[in-house]
Amino acid sequence: MKTAYLASLVLIVSTAYVIRLIAILPFFHTQAGTEKDTKDGVNLLKIRKSSKKPLKIFVFLGSGGHTGEMIRLLENYQDLLLGKSIVYLGYSDEASRQRFAHFIKKFGHCKVKYYEFMKAREVKATLLQSVKTIIGTLVQSFVHVVRIRFAMCGSPHLFLLNGPGTCCIISFWLKIMELLLPLLGSSHIVYVESLARINTPSLTGKILYWVVDEFIVQWQELRDNYLPRSKWFGILV
């Protein structure tokens, strides 16, 4: 009898979490787009502009071209993203951090907090080296993500990502928190695919397409031929 009760309890809990998982993964309830979406920053980035509280935004910088694209995106939407905002800046190389620090000086009203993330995988790394760095990144990123997510509670917030594989780890931790802690609400993860991806998505894009709340591409061909759930607003960077 006790075994039957325990089995029933496990089944109920498992069913509840499956339903919750379906609810937090936008892929299951987002319709495919067929036309160009309105290039409206509020709709594009899912921000509650009417809120009187400052926006809390997490931005992750990859390296090289990814950093350049992210900075141009922030600059193009500066009125929405950088107006009296609190920016949580994640980075994996010092050059990107310095580049952002130089850029953000123009917006003295923004508060910035820096978080260094290990790279999920180094270029030309062996399998063993990759496994080691991935485990280290998982642990370190979990600590950072938990701190940042709880700091955002009660305020309009956004996780803005593009580029490297570390974005996958960050997104997965956020979705796990949504799954286990429903009262936290949505993390509002927006992933912007690189301008260089015209016909096929990046490996990171292929993974995050199933996970993030909003997936944005910059070429119609990519949306129409490969990623029907994505949004296309034209060139953003």
Swiss-Prot record:
Topology in membrane: Single-pass membrane protein
Lumenal-side segments: 1-7
Biological processes annotated in GO: dolichol-linked oligosaccharide biosynthetic process
Signal peptide: none
InterPro entries: Oligosacch_biosynth_Alg14
Location(s) in or outside the cell: Endoplasmic reticulum membrane; Nucleus membrane
Keywords: Endoplasmic reticulum, Membrane, Nucleus, Transmembrane, Transmembrane helix
Gene3D superfamilies attached to this UniProt entry: Glycogen Phosphorylase B
One GO cellular component, as annotated: cytoplasmic side of Golgi membrane
Keyword Transferase annotated: no
TM helices/strands, residue ranges: 8-28
Major localisation: endoplasmic reticulum
Cytoplasmic compartment residues: 29-237
Any Pfam family hit: Alg14
Molecular function GO terms recorded: protein-membrane adaptor activity
Function: Involved in protein N-glycosylation. Essential for the second step of the dolichol-linked oligosaccharide pathway. Anchors the catalytic subunit ALG13 to the ER.
Other comment: Present with 339 molecules/cell in log phase SD medium.
Family, per entry: Belongs to the ALG14 family.
Quaternary structure and partners: Heterodimer with ALG13 to form a functional enzyme.
Name of the protein described by the UniProt record: UDP-N-acetylglucosamine transferase subunit ALG14
